């Protein structure tokens, strides 16, 4: 994933989550990326302090994604007058356990953070219940580097 590009897009709105092992993650608007070793200071000093943010990061990092590899299947423009930023990239995987295809879509802005060498995997996380007690499932793309280390995540859009 392109950390510098993500950092520029986040600006001062990003939040930093530090794990107990010392790894730091920059998170903003459903996207998170591991802060590379050697990066000491960022502009924003905010911390991820709510339970859901920490739960998502911990779930992403500890997820077993070995058999959930995603492949880009299509790009969709929902409005014929839309711009390039309105393109939704749809990824699919076939999970061996359930033998069904799972889809997750991300917007072109988030797609631009990915690199060719990134390995993309699928993850679902149940969100906290809302005020009506309903729990929704959030789909994520978990991004691994070429060595299989988790380096980021992108929350999927509900349009797909």
Where are each of the predicted segments found?
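Intrinsically disordered, low-complexity linker/loop segments enriched in Gly/Pro
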Residues: 1-22, 27-35
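C-terminal functional regions that serve as terminal interaction/effector modules
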Residues: 21, 28-32, 36-38, 43-160
């Amino acid at each position: 994933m392109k950390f510098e590009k993500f950092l520029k897009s986040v600006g001062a709105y990003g939040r930093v989550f530090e794990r107990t092992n010392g790894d730091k993650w920059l998170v903003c608007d459903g996207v998170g990326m591991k802060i590379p070793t050697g990066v000491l200071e960022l502009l924003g000093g905010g911390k991820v302090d709510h339970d859901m943010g920490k739960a998502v990061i911990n779930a992403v990092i500890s997820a077993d994604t070995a058999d959930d590899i995603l492949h880009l299947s299509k790009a969709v423009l929902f409005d014929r007058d839309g711009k390039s930023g309105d393109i939704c990239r749809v990824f699919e995987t076939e999970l061996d356990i359930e033998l069904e295809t799972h889809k997750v879509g991300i917007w072109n802005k988030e797609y631009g953070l990915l690199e060719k060498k990134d390995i993309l995997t699928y993850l679902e996380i149940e969100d906290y219940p809302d005020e009506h007690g309903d729990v929704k499932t959030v789909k994520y793309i978990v991004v691994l580097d070429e060595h299989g280390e988790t380096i980021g995540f992108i929350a999927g859009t509900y349009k797909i």
